[in-house]
Every structure is written in C-alpha cells, then in structure tokens.
Amino acid sequence: MHITYDLPVAIEDILEAKKRLAGKIYKTGMPRSNYFSERCKGEIFLKFENMQRTGSFKIRGAFNKLSSLTEAEKRKGVVACSAGNHAQGVSLSCAMLGIDGKVVMPKGAPKSKVAATCDYSAEVVLHGDNFNDTIAKVSEIVETEGRIFIPPYDDPKVIAGQGTIGLEIMEDLYDVDNVIVPIGGGGLIAGIAIAIKSINPTIKVIGVQAENVHGMAASYYTGEITTHRTTGTLADGCDVSRPGNLTYEIVRELVDDIVLVSEDEIRNSMIALIQRNKVITEGAGALACAALLSGKLDSHIQNRKTVSIISGGNIDLSRVSQITGLVDA
C-alpha cells in the first residue's frame, strides 16, 4: 500500500522506471561504515552510486528518459548538456539503445569526463564557459537539427529514474530512519523523496548543498524559486544556481530539511572517504558525508539508522592529489 501525493511524479512512475532499468544498471551496494557510525554515534550506511555504470547515479534517469521515447523520437536523435555525469549517462544510454546522441559540455569540463563521454558513443561539442552557455547551444541544435532534448534533472522520467535509488534503499534497509542526499538541480533528491515517502512518510529525507552554490536551499527556505551562487565549489557536479520547477515543487512538499556545508567540510569528507572507507568520490559525491561529519545533523542521526548517498566518483586523479595534499582527515 503506497501513499499517493499530488505531484508530477508518482511511485508508479518509479516502479515503471525500475522495470526499464532492470539488467541495464547495477543495484549498488550499501554497506555499514564503521568509521562514520562511530563518528556520528549512529548506524551509517553508504549507498555507493559512485560504483554505478558511468561512475554516478545519472545513468538511471538518462536511460529511463531515453528508453521511454517513441521510435519516431529516437530516430531524430537526442541532445543533452552537462559538465560531466549527465553527459556520460546520456552517452552510454544512447549506445545501449542505438540512438544518435550529441552532448554539449562547457570548455572547462574535466578532461576525464569529456573523454569518457566520447568513449561511450555520443558526439561531444565543447561550447561556452557555463551552464547557460551550453543551454543556448542546445537550443540552437534542437532548432537546426530537430533533436530531442534530454534534461539533466527537471523532467518526470529523469526524476523517476533517479527515484529507483529510493526503492533499493527500502529493499535493503526497510527500517532506515534518515536518507541524506546531495542536491544540485534536485532530480536525485526529488526522485528519492517520492520513493521513500510513498512507502514510509515517517522516514526523513534531508538534502545537502554547498554554501557557495545553494539555489535549492535558498528557494526551499524563502518559499519561491530563487538563484544563489557566490563562487565555484569542489562539488562541481552540484554547481547549479537555480533549481528546476518540477524538482523544487517536489522538494518543497516532501523534503524535511536542507543543510549547507563549507568547502573545507566537503574536502575533509572526500579525504575521510578515501582514508577510512577506501572510496574515491568527486566533491558532489561527498556532500552527504560532509553533512554527517559537520555535526549539523546530530539530532537526526544519533542512535538512528541513516543512509548517506555517495552520488558519484568521477574526478581527475590530479584533482584527488591536490585535495589530499591540502588537509588531514
């Protein structure tokens, strides 16, 4: 028996996405972390989406969206824009489904993410310096080539695909008390919140954003969609200054809280994951654990069971060396 909410995505959409994704993606592991459990005085489980195909959760939403296109739409080809993880998810999904794909990435995108996107199948177009520049280029491609745009987060099928993580959490740890989720544009937390709250509304779903870029948190607390970005962040995968319209609506309705973490807290979380759990994550992937270590969630997590989403691990090795040389865990 599921609880139904009057929202753009329902638990039924996520269950349908699970069927589409069966055999196409990994059901990622979710082990208990002794280190984080001891530090946080609760039971902490890490959901390793950095071990997912393409190195992040993004393939879930990308494949669900692409596989739901009509045959006529598939023949037109698709286009997406991304700094990395969505690009890789779309590129691999195109290869799996036999769809011609084109991805627009900013000129400053990490070299490893550009290379991986090319390797999976899609044609990569490097354009502009930021998300607004890439969106403008995508609009031009849609107009001139007739391709179908695959949004990175603000789309019901994309949100439903990301929500399959919530189903896996409930399958593996039904008595979980809290789920801590990184936020960029909001697709991941929106999908997870629908899945979790439809099954058990007493479970808390808490978001985490970087202090430097927190459009969703600013919108959540002011009650209207707004933009927030002061400068860049180590969590470059979550460097989204304005949330999506659909994702904001879902987050406003279902998410229990959003906390902010500093750049030092993100860095220390990345180092702790490497040193204590032998796990390499990108900055965005370390956001949830940064919130756990910060003490800002102590009232929620002490003596309770908490899942922390490690959303991705696509980071240049040179960047890892730079980060680990700055701060001790």
UniProtKB/Swiss-Prot annotation:
Q: How is its activity regulated?
A: Each protein molecule can bind up to four molecules of AMP, which act as an allosteric activator to the enzyme. The enzyme is inhibited by alpha-keto acids and other catabolites.
Query: InterPro entries in the record, alphabetically?
Result: Ser/Thr_Dehydratase (IPR050147), Ser/Thr_deHydtase_PyrdxlP-BS (IPR000634), Thr_deHydtase_catblc (IPR005789), TrpB-like_PALP (IPR001926), TrpB-like_PALP_sf (IPR036052)
UniProt keyword list: Allosteric enzyme, Lyase, Nucleotide-binding, Pyridoxal phosphate
Instruction: Tell me which residues bind AMP.
Output: 53-54, 88, 119-120, 314
Q: Name one GO biological process term.
A: L-serine catabolic process
Q: Which residues carry this modification: N6-(pyridoxal phosphate)lysine?
A: 58
Q: What class of enzyme is it?
A: lyase
Pathways per UniProt: Amino-acid degradation; L-threonine degradation via propanoate pathway; propanoate from L-threonine: step 1/4
Q: Which family does it belong to?
A: Belongs to the serine/threonine dehydratase family.
Q: How does it assemble?
A: In the native structure, TdcB is in a dimeric form, whereas in the TdcB-AMP complex, it exists in a tetrameric form (dimer of dimers).
What is this protein's function? Catalyzes the anaerobic formation of alpha-ketobutyrate and ammonia from threonine in a two-step reaction. The first step involved a dehydration of threonine and a production of enamine intermediates (aminocrotonate), which tautomerizes to its imine form (iminobutyrate). Both intermediates are unstable and short-lived. The second step is the nonenzymatic hydrolysis of the enamine/imine intermediates to form 2-ketobutyrate and free ammonia. In the low water environment of the cell, the second step is accelerated by RidA.
This one is known as L-threonine dehydratase catabolic TdcB
> Gene that codes for this?
tdcB
